[in-house]
């Protein structure tokens, strides 16, 4: 799938309207999501792969991976309300290969082929990004 088509499809994702700023939850714009996923796809990191989406929010990156042929995706987020939006988005796209899990990234175990994420940047909460990069 080409980047522009993916971007257009991802525009259909419902936004998460109640971000918790202390968790540094920010939406990933569709242009950025499509760009990141296109690069990962071209490098062979999506199609047929098992993917973890850390801090998945509304699920835009997970859904993009599913649309690009990922085998199995697990979206993790500490915020149950964000996961409800992610579930609605996967239902909207009739995607059934994504599992949504309420969990801190510190508690994730297991193996995958590819990790995608839009982590906190530690702007409001110093070192909030550490759990995502260690």
Give the residues covered by each predicted segment.
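Class I S-adenosyl-L-methionine-dependent methyltransferase catalytic core
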Residues: 1-134
């Amino acid at each position: 799938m080409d980047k522009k088509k993916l971007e257009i499809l991802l525009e259909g994702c419902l936004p998460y309207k109640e971000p918790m700023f202390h968790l540094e939850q920010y939406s990933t714009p569709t242009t950025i999501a499509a760009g990141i996923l296109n690069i990962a796809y071209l490098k062979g990191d999506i199609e047929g792969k098992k993917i973890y989406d850390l801090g998945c929010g509304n699920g835009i990156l997970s859904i993009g991976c599913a649309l690009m042929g990922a085998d199995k995706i697990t979206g993790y987020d500490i915020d149950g309300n964000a996961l409800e939006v992610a579930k609605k988005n996967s239902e909207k796209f009739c995607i059934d290969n994504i599992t949504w899990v309420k969990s801190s990234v510190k508690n994730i175990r297991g193996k995958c082929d590819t990790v995608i994420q839009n982590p906190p940047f530690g702007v409001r909460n110093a070192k909030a990004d550490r759990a995502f990069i260690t």
